[in-house]
Regions:
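Small/polar beta-strand repeat architecture
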Residues: 135-228
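Divalent metal-cofactor coordination and adjacent catalytic microenvironments
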Residues: 1-142, 222-228
Length: 228
């Protein structure tokens, strides 16, 4: 088996300003070096724990499906979404397992995928790398804010529906006003894929964002194994 990161995070989980403050460093001359060390520390921690701090896309490659209805266990958590399960069929063609044919148990650690009742994993060509599971994992994803449109953009997160609960956090600055950390907000509308407005209550009006915030803004969802 093999785990390949195909779309890395666009940002580190901490802003260099927060790390600089922790190091009691007043000048910015060493920011590039600090970022380099931070990136190495993040990689080490993620590989040690098999947990992804900022959302990224992975491909998990197996030589075959588990026997019959046995589970595929996702090796990097927390799982955001399964994008696709592709396999090389016995005739050599690439096929995709329909979403309706498998179930995802995200309450289990590590998350597991099994065929739904009455279904089985398909037969594959007897060669290495015949099964490829593409998935997104991470505790949170970076957010860009359009304060004039009162919208946020979260392209690295799974598509969300109106009414879903989200939380925001920040590193190296402040959240867009009037948003606060450790506070539940609700998807008020889906402006376009990955772009949303937020409400302070379920079914409420869109929050009027009076600033875009500073530093790094992140979005996560309660229940995603400790997201913000």
């Amino acid at each position: 088996v093999s785990l390949i990161q195909i779309t890395p995070p666009t940002v580190l989980p901490l802003h260099v300003a927060d790390v600089r403050q922790h190091l009691k460093q007043d000048i910015t001359d060493d920011d590039n070096l600090i970022s380099l060390y931070l990136g190495s520390a993040v990689d080490f921690a993620q590989n040690l724990t098999q947990r992804q701090l900022v959302a990224a896309r992975f491909r998990y490659v197996l030589d075959e499906f588990p026997c019959h209805d046995a589970a595929i266990r996702i090796p990097r958590t927390p799982l955001i979404q399964v994008v696709s399960i592709e396999y090389t069929a016995v005739d050599g063609t690439t096929q995709t397992v329909p979403n309706a044919d498998y179930a995802i148990d995200n309450s289990f650690d590590p998350p597991r995928i099994t065929p739904v009742y009455g279904k089985y994993w398909p037969y594959t060509l007897d060669q290495i790398g015949s099964v490829r599971v593409t998935f997104d994992a991470g505790y949170s994803a970076p957010v860009t804010v359009d304060a004039t449109a009162n919208s946020i953009s979260v392209p690295a997160w799974r598509p969300m529906l109106v009414g879903e609960v989200v939380r925001m956090n920040n590193s190296g600055g402040v959240l867009p006003a009037p948003l606060a950390a450790k506070t539940d907000y609700y998807i008020q509308s889906v402006v376009s894929p990955g772009v949303y407005t937020l409400a302070a209550s379920s079914g409420g009006a869109a929050i009027d964002l009076t600033s875009a915030g500073t530093g790094l803004n992140f979005l996560g969802q309660p229940g995603i194994n400790g997201s913000p």
